[in-house]
Amino acid sequence: MEEHIQIFDTTLRDGEQTPGVNFTFDERLKIAKQLEKWGVDVLEAGFPASSTGSFKSVEAIAKTLTTTAVCGLARCKKSDIDAVYEATKEAVKPQVHVFIATSPIHLEHKLKMTQDEVLTSIKEHVSYAKQFFEVVQFSPEDATRTEIPFLIECVQTAINAGATIINIPDTVGFSYPTEYGEIFKQLTQAVKSNSKIIFSAHCHDDLGMAVANSLAAIEGGARRIEGTVNGIGERAGNASLEEVALALYVRKDHYGLESQINLEETKKTSDLISRYAGIRVPRNKAIVGQNAFSHESGIHQDGVLKHRETYEIMTPQLVGVNTTELPLGKLSGKHAFAEKLKALGYEIKLEDQVTLFKQFKEIADKKKNVSDRDIHAIIHGSEHEHNAIFQLDNLQLQYVSKGLQSAVVVIKERNGQVKQDSSIGTGSIVAIYNAVDRIFKKDAELIDYRIDSVTEGTDAQAEVHVRIIINHIEVTGIGIDHDILKASCKAYIDAHAKYISEYELKEGIRT
């Protein structure tokens, strides 16, 4: 195979460390399938030893994917490595990612180990991992704050023990492009190996240089880039993989190497992660933001109309942004709807299409044109409600007095059982959320509430995102409906359901 830049996606592991992001089991599977469709080389599916839930997710992903390598994270602990092996053993290409911190501040304050003890641990655990895995990746955590001589010693020890991939994490986003690229040059020149070693870059965005550092690493000899979709991750996030992939494509004249990313799946992948994570993509976000291909200046508009390349270095179609969609309407039939689903890349069973078509007709009766974004919302909303353990069955609101509202909420469980309660509050939303809290017998704190319109216009569907805290645990919820209050109620129920399914029904799973 011709040499290319490997894309190592850690959206489901490092990306899920974003505050408030808790993907469900089903969401992780759907994300994994879409990432494979997008064309990532390796998917870091999770940290199997951290919890039973994480183990089961990694195991399910390993059994599901057909072309993408599945990797699990492990500390320098044999039990961690054993967990990765058990979780990924049915993957088509299993990999393990072993790490230990190497910087002075981590050795002194976190590990309380000497440099010699760290070297011994690297040798012991990388060689142990090599007994089970053909591909072993080693990461010296906080590498960019590690003295270069010791970093070289750690890397050489890992290679001697059997590591085939060396990842250099800029764990706290401390480095800058010139410095980071130079680290790779020094390492590739200093280490010795009888077999091919792939160097990998893992950058955080604390100083806003994660993508620039990743590209500098390629110039320094890296052939694998790690990151997340939309750059999600703890603190300021990780390197945005869609930006890396497009930079390699657009500037192949400079880098000379491309990724194997299916660029046309980029926007769809970004939208999926945004919806499940509950994190809106900024309008001015490179590649996938709403303004990425917009031109406000009259001079720019005139130039683009005369010749697109005057102000655009890539086309919207390249990343899967459809600018020539033909909207459906209330007169559109089942065949036209089925063809639209197919054109949008969905493979949906005929019996499921019947339900979706009914929802489409309900929306078409309320608005003149049903756009592609409406169709996406119908499908994702339907999938979300189908997999939900609780659904909104009925909502009634009534004005009481002095600004107080009364809300009656009826919720149906998956087993058919119905729960109902009522409450009052200073406004409709407060009343609704108080009633839901009473149903679930939870004292939840609402910390974020956001309404997005699925499309433009007064007849748009509302997509509500909420973040709540229950028992010091932060969870998110999504609700879609033409009625903003119903969408708000659905989102709040969804957040409660996520907490219950992840932290109560599976009590003891997470650590």
From Swiss-Prot:
Its EC number is 2.3.3.13. It comes from Staphylococcus epidermidis (strain ATCC 35984 / DSM 28319 / BCRC 17069 / CCUG 31568 / BM 3577 / RP62A). CDD domains: DRE_TIM_IPMS. Mn(2+) binds at residues 14, 202, 204, 238. Belongs to the alpha-IPM synthase/homocitrate synthase family. LeuA type 1 subfamily. One of its GO terms (cellular component) is cytoplasm. Signal peptide: none annotated. Residues 5-267 form the Pyruvate carboxyltransferase domain. The gene is leuA. Residues 391-511 are annotated as: Regulatory domain. This is 2-isopropylmalate synthase. Homodimer. InterPro entries: 2-IPM_HCS-like, 2-isopropylmalate_synth_dimer, AIPM/Hcit_synth_CS, Aldolase_TIM, LeuA/HCS_post-cat, LeuA_allosteric_dom_sf, LeuA_bact_synth, PYR_CT. Pathway: Amino-acid biosynthesis; L-leucine biosynthesis; L-leucine from 3-methyl-2-oxobutanoate: step 1/4. Its cofactor is Mn(2+).
